[in-house]
Amino acid sequence: MPKNTSLKKVLLIGSGPIQIGQAAEFDYAGSQACKAVREEGIEVVLVNSNPATIQTDPETADKVYVEPLKADIIAEIIKKEKPDGILSGMGGQTGLNLTAELYELGALEGVQILGTPLEAIYHGEDRDLFKKLMLEIGEPIPKSFILTKIEQLDEAYEEVGLPAIIRPAYTLGGAGGGVANTKEELRTIVEHGLTKSRVHQVLIEESVKGWNEIEFEVMRDAADTCIIICGMENVDPMGVHTGESVVVAPILSLTSDEFGIMRRAAIKIIRALNVQGGCNIQFAFNNGDYRVIEVNPRVSRSSALASKATGYPIARVAAKVAIGLHLDEIMNTVTGCTPACFEPAVDYVVVKVSRWPFDKFKTADRTLTTSMKSTGEVMAIGRTVEEGFKKALRSLDTDIYRHTDLNEIRMILSRPTDERFPTLFDAFRLGMTVKEVYDLTQIEPFFLEKIQNVVDIELELRDHPTEELVKTSKKFGFSNAEIRELTGWNIYKIESLVGLPTYKMVDTCSAEFPAKTPYYYSTWEQECELTQSDRKKILILGSGAIRIGQGIEFDYCTVHAVKSLREEGIEVHILNNNPETVSTDFDTSDRLYFEPMQLEDVVNILRKGDYDGVMVQFGGQNSVNLAIPIQEEIKLFGLKTKVLGTSPDNMDVAEDRNRFSVLLDQNNIPSPANGSAYSEKEAYAIANKIGYPVLVRPSYVLGGRAMELVHDELELQTYIKEAVRVSNTHPVLIDRYLDNATELDVDAVSDGETVLIGGVMEHIEEAGVHSGDSACVIPTQTLTPEQIATVKDYTRKIALSLGVVGLINIQYAIHKGTVYVLEANPRASRTVPFVSKATGLPLAKIAAKLMLGKKLADLGYQEKEISHVAVKEVLLPFSRLPGVDPILGPEMKSTGEVIGIDYDFGRAFYKASQAADNTIPLKGNVFISVTNDQKTEILPIARKLYDLGFSLYGTEGTVKFLAQNDIPMNLVRKVQEGSPNILDMIRALDVHLLINTPGDKNARADHLQIMRASIDYSIPYITTIFGAEAAVQAIESMKTNTITVEPLSHYHS
């Protein structure tokens, strides 16, 4: 039993939806913590609003609540469940903030705060308290000023000067912060920071921009035992958020004395905070001098990286410590024979590189500052820094543009952006020196020299290739494909020369002790540490870095597939490179490979491992794109491995527009008029034949990348170039646009003979908004029984015609009563977790068993009719990305999702909106501005809002139209008509809901300004008529009902 015997039941707060600054690392941390606490015989109650996480699976905790993460709702759960303790440190910034709020509400009476004490939360998050504590214990901090109102700005400016770094209190991933170089920038960032801070507090500190950034991950228990789990150094200097920076572990550029100084400081700080559990401490370092920058008294993104980098299960150990165990009483489950008080040792180099959404958002400001913009990250492991850098860049799976103009390179290097790290290689290719590059970037010369080493080998390979040099280049992380490109040699000659890589273990102890659950990375040395069993083995490809269009949903599917296969006695191995996820946890699979997910890396593992099968269905579009190449390589090398599930050729039928159209025609299934164009000329001819507007998109891409709705030939000219560039080996797909259609998503599984439909989801936004960005609902709300029957019939016909074995997602549109098929994806989709949580059907688990050859009839699952309503709503990243067009369209923009469950649509939609931080007000002022052709559609919505007691505001045209229909509305000036206008109302917080649909190009500028202001001031906004109708239903329902707060099992039973 744990030392704290008073604990019988513990509440764990999750982190909510995936968003910039808070990604899958908390799914991993919370899932590990639940397991760790339950092992000690303590009941766990979990609350989280994210349906896409393993954490919200019914089997993760004793009770799972998928409710909005709001203090009043959690207070109600506490009343109902009466937990003895609350674990706040596993839910990221959200968990800490909510714990502080619950305490301030008086909701934690009789509930122990475990692990991270309240004082530590306040000292770590409140900038003023943190500053006082550091001064008290004699730790140096940058000169700073704390303000709580904008009127203090002049005083702060006089005291701190410029440049200055702005850090709001209680915010996530540096939200609302930044670096100010002018007084105008200072005012803008501080105003924004004050609105983002929970306590309306901002720290302005002297800039230590250009200093090295060093981090320590520290663990402490109740007996005051402290250990350093991992030291990490940021390649990017201070001024760039650590979540954005390239990070290297272990610390390599400091002397042992310098390392020792900061190690002692880190231990002193965690003791002063009295944290029991994990803590992340960040320092700025410059020529022997250092400053304490910040403390995260919780599990963080850096903790996830440190955990995967060392193999030390930080979240698991932190949870055990929080419930009273000491480090020497906790076993390290990786070795199975050493206690958790042993500091990890590493004999390799780990590199983390972030992934940004700028391929989606061309207009976003790409400058990296103290406020995060990245959506995910990859981790690579090598024996050298050089190998780590090369493997990390390969793992990103992005196009890296080569710069050949020195002036352009100097400009890119002079400010931190997502392009700077790969451009360092270009600088050395063109002969710049380490000193020149350092002067522009302030990047530690140690790392610049490593990049120069890579470039030196690259240039030698190009100019003087030898067999010895080729072998050397492999140790520096070069792929065979790169070597072929540089040398011009035949790929088979290279492969026969270098052979296969060796695989080394990550085991927390540099192989001092035998490891029970190690994971592996490839390198080019003599001794291979892999061992083989005679069990049946399957390799599953993961989904890599979280990006828009390919999020945590695919990791959820991967983990479910692993669990399902292990139940069947299969030895399951995973290939993935995302350090944040549950799939890369030490004990999820029988073996984990931390590797790039390129064809060469996959095939090397297949050749080394004697696999019976490989599964590509669960890792999203990137894994599916490898299906045909993997099958060709399997034939080439004569391997026994099979690509399991739907055949790669049938996957291609679904992607190839012409082949798929033939299949639909054979089954008499309608689809919108469409065509495939291989050239611009063909595209114009197809679009003219179909008639504008048309949807144009490349094939074989995820998240609707480069998909656009184009209205005329001029727009097509602009967009077709982008689409062709994105997918130059595949045709561009052009479809008729079905305006005002109702869009549907269907997730199903098939064994090749029978089809089980998991759920039919109705989109709340109209067709034309990417399915990943639209809210959706199960069961459907407006479809007739005949339409539902048609959709199910078409789903069965398509799945069987495609020979689907496993999962399939099909998108439909209902236009003027006709059901049209838009597309089919015979793989895991981003809605699989939502459908599983809504219905209780574990679709990914079922699919994995079917891919083994089992039949649906033997598994005993049936389609489910549910009596409740589940709504999925999305989280959009616009508050993080200034300059981005916030209007939804056919290209996906959301980063994560939430779920709302209740017994009618209105309450479920209200809960989903609340969980997505777009809470619909139940009273106040509503601003309405719609296009002329939508005025009749807004009429019933405006009337209902007025009848519900709202005051309506609008511009002249809307006011006149509503007056003609006896609905009073207050007149507001348009933006270009001068003040006071709608922007002034937003800034004064005098408007509580905006319904503003985008108009033509002339009105769009106004619309964008209004949208941006509403985002900055956190005012809920709606941009479609369909969304406005749903909001009115929510308000009506909430006026007459209260929301239901029950565990997920209550709905499934």
From Swiss-Prot:
Required cofactor(s): Mg(2+); Mn(2+)
Amino acids binding ATP 2: 697, 736, 738, 743, 768-771, 811, 823
Binding positions for Mn(2+) 1 per the UniProt entry: 282, 294
Keyword Metal-binding: yes
Biological or metabolic pathway of the protein: Amino-acid biosynthesis; L-arginine biosynthesis; carbamoyl phosphate from bicarbonate: step 1/1; Pyrimidine metabolism; UMP biosynthesis via de novo pathway; (S)-dihydroorotate from bicarbonate: step 1/3
Binding residues annotated for Mn(2+) 2, in chain numbering: 294, 296
Region (Carboxyphosphate synthetic domain): 1-397
A GO biological-process term: glutamine metabolic process
Domain ATP-grasp as annotated: residue spans: 131-323, 661-852
Catalytic reaction list: hydrogencarbonate + L-glutamine + 2 ATP + H2O = carbamoyl phosphate + L-glutamate + 2 ADP + phosphate + 2 H(+)
Residues that bind Mn(2+) 4: 823, 825
GO annotation, cellular component aspect: cytoplasm
InterPro entries linked: ATP-grasp, ATP_grasp_subdomain_1, CarbamoylP_synth_lsu, CarbamoylP_synth_lsu_oligo, CarbamoylP_synth_lsu_oligo_sf, CbamoylP_synth_lsu-like_ATP-bd, CbamoylP_synth_lsu_CPSase_dom, MGS-like_dom
Residues the record lists as binding Mg(2+) 1: 282, 294
UniProt similarity note: Belongs to the CarB family.
Described purpose of this protein according to its UniProt entry: Large subunit of the glutamine-dependent carbamoyl phosphate synthetase (CPSase). CPSase catalyzes the formation of carbamoyl phosphate from the ammonia moiety of glutamine, carbonate, and phosphate donated by ATP, constituting the first step of 2 biosynthetic pathways, one leading to arginine and/or urea and the other to pyrimidine nucleotides.
Protein name per UniProt: Carbamoyl phosphate synthase large chain
